[in-house]
């Protein structure tokens, strides 16, 4: 196993809690916030992947908006244009998990090169990172838009290798999403799965090199 020279992080669900939109959903639709958030996220990913398979790539934000429309229709909720816009804008204000800021700072202090490699658009990645005050921690903010393919497609992971300018075997890819970890491992990255909730790992023919419960543990991995 090669020495780790750089780390690429997934954004949604790894650095940032996608279910931090629950409060906004609950305010809009009392008693239904959590259910909306769960179905919305499920359809967001599903629509992105299906569009990719269909050869009809759209930006992740459009897939997010479409997923919200489906969710409201499925749950028989009235959702006018203004309400939909307010909820989708919550994805620009996602909250980082509690340990993220400290872990990023510690990794940078150890001289580690850091990047985000996300299915989100360039504009959204910049907005989310800026709004959470951690933009100075990253060397690269990488969107899959230039590849026009969503993770876990190999073309998406290739962007991280190109940005860092080093071999994929020297890059650690970190995600809390098993499908993302599997895609990155198949591409050739070293991979770390953040398993915050004690889930079983997906049976996709890949195994993470490291599994940690929270992001702080990555700092100790690098220090070894």
From Swiss-Prot:
Q: Give any GO molecular function from the UniProt entry.
A: haloacetate dehalogenase activity
Keyword annotations from UniProtKB, A to Z: Hydrolase, Plasmid
Q: Spell out the InterPro entries in the cross-references.
A: 2-HAD, HAD-like_sf, HAD-SF_hydro_IA, HAD_sf, PGP-like_dom2, S-2-haloacid_dehalogenase
Top-rank EC class of the record's enzyme: hydrolase
Any Pfam family: Hydrolase
Renumbered to this chain, the signal peptide range is none
Q: What else is known?
A: Two haloacetate dehalogenase enzymes exist in Moraxella strain B. DehH1 acts predominantly on fluoroacetate, dehH2 acts on chloro-, bromo- and iodoacetate, but not on fluoroacetate.
Q: How is this protein named in the record?
A: Haloacetate dehalogenase H-2
Tell me what organism the protein belongs to: Moraxella sp. (strain B)
């Amino acid at each position: 196993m090669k020495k780790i020279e750089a780390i690429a992080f997934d954004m949604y669900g790894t650095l940032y809690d996608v279910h931090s939109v629950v409060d906004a959903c609950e305010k809009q639709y009392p008693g239904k916030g959590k259910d909306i958030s769960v179905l919305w996220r499920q359809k967001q990913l599903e629509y992105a992947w299906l569009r990719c398979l269909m050869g009809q790539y759209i930006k992740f934000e459009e897939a997010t908006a479409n997923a919200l429309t489906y969710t409201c229709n499925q749950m028989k909720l009235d959702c006018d244009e203004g309400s939909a816009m307010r909820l989708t804008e919550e994805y620009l204000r996602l909250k980082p998990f509690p340990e993220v800021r400290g872990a990023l700072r510690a990794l940078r202090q150890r001289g580690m090169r850091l990047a985000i490699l996300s299915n989100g658009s360039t504009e959204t990645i910049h907005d989310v990172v800026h709004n959470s005050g951690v933009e100075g921690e990253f060397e690269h903010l990488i969107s899959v838009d230039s590849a026009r393919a969503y993770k876990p497609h190999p073309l998406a992971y290739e962007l991280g290798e190109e940005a860092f300018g080093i071999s994929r075997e020297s890059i650690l890819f970190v995600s809390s999403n098993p499908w993302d970890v599997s895609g990155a491992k198949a591409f050739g990255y070293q991979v770390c799965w953040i398993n915050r909730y004690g889930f079983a790992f997906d049976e996709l023919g890949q195994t993470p090199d490291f599994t940690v419960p929270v992001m702080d543990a990555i700092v100790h991995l690098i220090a070894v």
